[in-house]
Amino acid sequence: MCLKMRYERIKYILLFSLMHLVYSNSTFESFTENPHISSQISNVLYMDQMFIIYILICILLILISVIVYLSKRYSQQMMQSSDNITNRRSNPEVRNKSNIYDLPPLLDVTSVNEETPIVKRPINERIENLEFDPRFEIDQAKLEISEDKLGSGFFGEVCYGLLSMRTSNTETDTLQKLSVAVKQSNDPTQENQEKMIEDETKLMCAIGRNPNILAIIGAVTANSGSARNLLIVEFVECGDLLKFLEEKKSIFKDELVYEKNGYLLPKSIRRKTYMFNENEDDVIEESLDSLCTSDLLSFSYQIAEGMEYLASIPCVHRDLALRNVLLNKNKTIRIADFGLARKYQVDGYYRITKGVGTPMPARWMAPEVMREGKCTEKSDVWSYGVSLYEMFSLGELPYSNVSNSDVFEHVVQGNQLPMPQYCHPKMYDRMKQFWNFDATFRPSFSKCVEFFEEHLSVSATNLLEQIQKTLKSEAERQSKLEDWIRRD
C-alpha cells in the first residue's frame, strides 16, 4: 500500500514536470492556481522531503554504529595484543632472553592474610594485609652500622653497614663481610616512624628480587627483641642517578647526530640518528668517568624493565623520578623508595593540593593523581615520561620556569614538556604518549620495554645485547644475597 502511494506521488511529480515543459509558463501557472491541485503538489513535495531526511538519518545512524563497532573491536585487539606481549615476556622459551624475569618473589603475596588474592590491588595499598617473612630476620650481632650517613629524610636515615657471614661451620673459616645500606628511623620512640620502616620492610619482602629493583637482604625487627626496626638492603655505590647526570654533564658525549643528507632539508626538520660504533663489543663504558647517549638509553631501558616488573606484581611506585633511581658502578640501576612517604604525609618537594590531602611531587604527578589521588600503573607511566625528560636533558628540573604552586594549572592547560636537547625525535614522540590526559591511552610498561627493544634493535643491536647480558649477571648476583640470611 505504501509503495503504491509512493508510486502515485512520483506520477504526480512527473506529470507536473511534463506540463511545465509542454505548456507556457502562464498556462502552467493558471493550471496550478487551482487550490486543490496546488495543495496536492505541496503535500507531495513535503512528504518527499521528509522521506529524504528519514533516509539520511538512517544512513547517519548506520555509520555511527559501524564506527562504534570498529572502535570496540580495535580496543579488544589492543588488549589482546598487550596480553600476548605480557605472555611472551614471561615465557623464557618464547622470549629467548635471560631468566631475570622469572625470579620468584620471596613472599607469596597471593596468600598472605588474604581472602581475595592480593594481586587484585597493588600491594602497597594492601600493606596492612602483609606480614613480615621471618626468613629475613637477621641477627643484629652480625651487623655493624657505621656513623657515615648515605642519606637522610624526614622520618629516617640510611647508613653504611657491614653484614658478617662465615663460609662454613668450621672454626678455621674466615669471616666474610658484605657492604649493605641500613635504613632506620630518626627517632625510635616515634611510633609512626617505626611503622614506616616496618611497612617498607614488608613491602620489599613481597616485591622480591629483580636486577633493576633495589633488593632487600634482611631486617632486624622487634620480634628479635630489638629496640628499633632496621631494614638492610643492597649497597649501591654511586648514589642517585639525578646527581650523577648533573655531575657528569660537562663530559657528556652526544652520540645523536644529524643524518648526512640533512643539509638538503631545513634544519628544523632534519632527521637525527645515533652515531654508535657497532664494531665494538661494548658500547657502554663501565667507567663512571664517562657519560654518553648510550648510557642514557641504557638507563631508560632499565627503568622501564624494573617498572614492568613492579606492574606485574602489581605494585604502584607513586614517586618515580631520577632522584629515586640508584646507580651501581657497572652502570646498572636500581629503582628505590616506593612512595610510602606519601602515606605518612612527608613534605619537602611535595605539595598539598588546596591545602589538604596527601603530599605530592607535583612536577612528576599525572593529572588524575593530583585531582583524585588515584595511583595506577598508568600514572607511573606519566611519571616515567617526566623522568625521561630529566634523563635526556641531563638533570634539568621539569617545568623549570613554573613555580611549584602553579604546576598543576600549567599541566591541565595542556602544556607539555619540550623535547630535551639530547633526545631522539622518535623517543620524544613516545614520551608525548606517556602524557596523554586519558590514562587509558597511555602505553603500559610492557609496551615501553617493547618500544626500547625495537628502537635499540634497529639503531644499536650491540648496546641492547650488552644491557641484557649485564642484567643477567646482576640477577645471578642478587640471587646469592639469600646466602647472607640462610647461613649461620
Swiss-Prot record:
GO terms for molecular function: ATP binding; transmembrane receptor protein tyrosine kinase activity. Residues 1-26 form the signal peptide. It comes from the Eukaryota. The chain crosses the membrane at residues 51-70. The keyword Glycoprotein applies. SMART domains: TyrKc (SM00219). Residues 27-50 are extracellular. The keyword Membrane applies. Hypodermal cells. May be specifically involved in cell-cell interactions regulating cell fusions that generate the hypodermis during postembryonic development. It has a role in the development of the HYP7 hypodermal syncytium. This is Receptor-like tyrosine-protein kinase kin-15. It comes from Caenorhabditis elegans. The lineage of its organism: Eukaryota, Metazoa, Ecdysozoa, Nematoda, Chromadorea. The gene is kin-15.
